[in-house]
From Swiss-Prot:
UniProt keyword annotations, A-Z: DNA-binding, Plasmid, Repeat, Transcription, Transcription regulation
Similarity remark: Belongs to the TBP family.
Entry function: General factor that plays a role in the activation of archaeal genes transcribed by RNA polymerase. Binds specifically to the TATA box promoter element which lies close to the position of transcription initiation.
Descriptive protein name: TATA-box-binding protein D
Sequence repeats: 10-86, 101-179
PANTHER family per UniProt: TATA-BOX BINDING PROTEIN
Gene: tbpD
GO molecular function annotation: DNA binding; DNA-binding transcription factor activity; general transcription initiation factor activity
Single biological process term from Gene Ontology: DNA-templated transcription initiation
HAMAP family hit by this protein: TATA_bind_prot_arch
Entry-linked InterPro entries: TBP (IPR000814), TBP_archaea (IPR033711), TBP_dom_sf (IPR012295)
Domain of life: Archaea
Natural source organism: Halobacterium salinarum (strain ATCC 700922 / JCM 11081 / NRC-1) (Halobacterium halobium)
Length: 186
């Protein structure tokens, strides 16, 4: 039997690391196959991987941000591959630079249509933003876990801001409980 939290799917994981080394981006873009660097458009090198599918943004300070991975394991694998590719170029990077998950974006569903006007009133205006003329979703901010949930009339939702996948599951359980208590779910 499937549960509500089974509808949650990770769409994107963003993580950062510090390579502990300042980098010459012009040279890096030349030496690193497939790297893109256009300082007029973006101040870092963009290095894409096909497996795991991701893009790592590498800055001259040695900071790097990996985005596009679809699991926490994938983001760790992607950063490890990038670090190895940089080491292969002779760049001295300490062993196992720490990886910090900054944001996990998940999608999910409450499996029913929602009355967003009633939800906005029921949840209270202090934690809710709902302006359907500007955006079709209701923005609901939770404190624990510290995430933002976008609710749509279709019952679909997006949960962002978590640092581990359990945050999304917990958020969905809280939302389901609150909406049920308000009599807004069937």
């Amino acid at each position: 039997m499937s549960t509500l939290t089974d509808t949650i799917q990770i769409e994107n994981v963003v993580a950062s690391t510090d390579l502990s080394q300042e980098l010459a981006l012009e040279q890096l873009a030349t030496d690193l196959p497939g790297a893109e660097y256009n300082p007029g458009d973006f101040p870092g090198v963009i290095y894409r991987l096909d497996d795991p599918k991701s893009a790592t943004l590498i800055f001259d300070s040695g900071k790097a941000v990996c985005t596009g991975a679809q699991s926490v394991d994938d983001v760790h694998d992607a950063i490890s591959i990038v670090v190895e590719d940089l080491r292969d170029l002779g760049i001295d990077i300490p062993p196992s630079p720490p990886v910090h998950v900054q944001n996990i974006v998940c999608s999910g569903s409450l499996d029913q249509d929602l009355n967003l006007n009633a939800i906005a009133i029921g949840l209270g205006l202090e934690d809710v933003e709902y302006e359907p003329e500007q955006f079709p979703g209701l923005v609901y901010r939770l404190n624990d876990p510290d995430v933002v949930v976008l609710l749509f009339g279709s019952g679909k939702l997006v949960i962002t801001g978590g640092s581990n996948p359990d945050d999304a599951h917990h958020a969905l359980e809280i939302i389901h409980e609150r909406l049920t208590d308000l009599g807004l779910l069937e």
